[in-house]
Amino acid sequence: MQSLKFVALDEEDLAIISTHLQDATVKVADVLWRPQEKRLVIGLDRFDWLSAEGDKPEFRRCRAALRFERVAACKCKQVNPAGKAAVLNLLAVEFEPTDTPGGVVKLLFSGGGVLRLEVECLEAELADLGPTWTVDMRPAHVADVLDARG
């Protein structure tokens, strides 16, 4: 598997990043909000959906970082920032434009958790940080996406 590195400057770019982040696991301790820098950085373990397809599927994960710049506010719904050991399952990342070029980025987690970012403009980056490792199973829980969107 080749390392991924994507930059998102619009909704279409973010949709590509969201696809690669479906079913990534995130420890609450790995969510870093820097209000003075207007930056949110998330360390996560993303599932490699491309390796899970084909005649000989392999289930792998890779450590990655997701970074958002120009973040004016970050709010949590059903995510306890004090619960540092909790592990969240990322289902999707969405962008809703408000005052162009600004808008709201939503990171939707299974169980209804949401991180809501108010951004001056969409500026995000996803980058793999190291080698992959194998895992035993492919993630499966489609109904949670509807719950998270509420």
Model-predicted segments: where are they?
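Short, well-ordered loop/turn elements at secondary-structure boundaries
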Residues: 35-36, 101, 110
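Intrinsic, low-complexity N-terminal interaction/targeting segments
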Residues: 15-23, 41, 77-107, 115-116, ...
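Short, well-structured hydrophobic secondary-structure segments
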Residues: 23-75
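Short linear functional motifs in flexible/disordered or boundary regions
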Residues: 29, 54, 83-84, 129
